[in-house]
Structure formats: structure tokens, C-alpha cells
Amino acid sequence: GWRVVAGVNGDYYDTANGIALGSVMSDGVFHNISGSYYALGFYDDGSAVMGKPDLRISAETDYDSFSISAMNYIRQTSFGIFMYDDSFNARGTIGTSEPGYDVICSVRRGELSIGGEMTLEVEDIVEGSVDTAVGRGQYVLSANLNSGENYLNALRALRVGDRITVSVDANSSEWDGVTNLIGALYQLVENGRVCSGLSAGNAPRTAVGLRRDGSLVMYTIDGRQKGLSIGATIQ
């Protein structure tokens, strides 16, 4: 294996629940999927890709297709279909007992990967104020009962035994084949130019840069220690 000589932290997370804001993948397995953040991805050969992949989760059945808002994130009250596996929390549940509509599925073929497909089969359907359990090898598609009718109708059309093809796609094929990925909140530089609209506040910072030759440079700056380190802005 590799001899590790240094490490840096990455992404931001929700301090209330520890969930990363951006997408997370390790050894080819997605732990979170969110389409709205920047990311740093690695291929098996160690090369990297950086940018905003705009990940999209799509579901298709024999008679319908619909979008999934995110995987392993807190279910929103008023919109969206969310997907969960058994790693979302220590209880192995979807994490909420607010009234919802949950479709419990098992994996029949494939796995979630960028540019790939996974086939699910509907095993059970739960409606009500239930913190639905997610077993090993299962996924749950879930929507709050206050969500828009289009989301609820997509789930209510499903029946036990139905097959669902779930795919994850990026805005560029350069993300296909990535096996490790971590999110980032800001892009600092693009094509050698500093991006506009960056925060001016000082704080501890971690940054990663991708050179034109494909090599990486990593920065970590301490902060919030009066008299020792005040951190840095991201401008």
C-alpha cells in the first residue's frame, strides 16, 4: 500500500448531524450525493479531476422517470425525493419520523457510480410518521407528505416488484471512473485567475490546487489562535 506522509481535512459539514455538505465517495462507494457543490475526485491511478460536477441522480421505471434530489441528506419538508442507504445514520434509518412516503428497495444489479447504473426492486412501501429502517443492501426512496404532488405521485405509482434503474451523471465524462471524491464549498482560482465573490473573513483554511501537469498542491492554514495564527481569507 501507500506510505502516508501527510493528510488534510476536506469539505464543510453540518455541525448538527455531521453530514458533509458536498458529495463523498470512497473506494467507489457513494456515502453522500449532492449536486450543488464543487468537488475533487481521484481515479484509481492517483490522477485527479477538480471542478463542479453537477451530479444528477435519475430514476427510471417501465412507465415513468423522475429525479432524486440527493442521497443521504436530511429530507426536506416541502420538496424532493431523497434516497438513503443503511450508512446514513447509526440507527440504520432515514432519520426522520415526519409524515412521509417511503419506498423500500433491494439492489438487483450494479452499484451507484458516476456514469453507471444500479437496478433496484421495490420490496415494501411505508406511508405515515415512521422513521423507516434501511437494511443492509437496501435503499429507500422517500418524500415528505408536504412535498409537491409530482414527487409524491412518482413514488405512489410504484408497486411491490417494480424495477427501478437509478443512474448518477455528471456534466462531463471526465468524472466517469472516479473512485474517491470529496466536496468543496468554494472555487478559488479558475484558469489561473482568482474567482470573484469570495469571502473576506479570516479563518482556518484548507485548499487544494490542480496544476496543468496533473500534480496537486495542498495548503492548510491554522487560525483562531490569538497571538499565534489568525488564519487567512479565501480571496
Annotated model-derived regions:
Residues G1-Q235:
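Gly/Ser/Thr/Pro-rich low-complexity, intrinsically disordered segments
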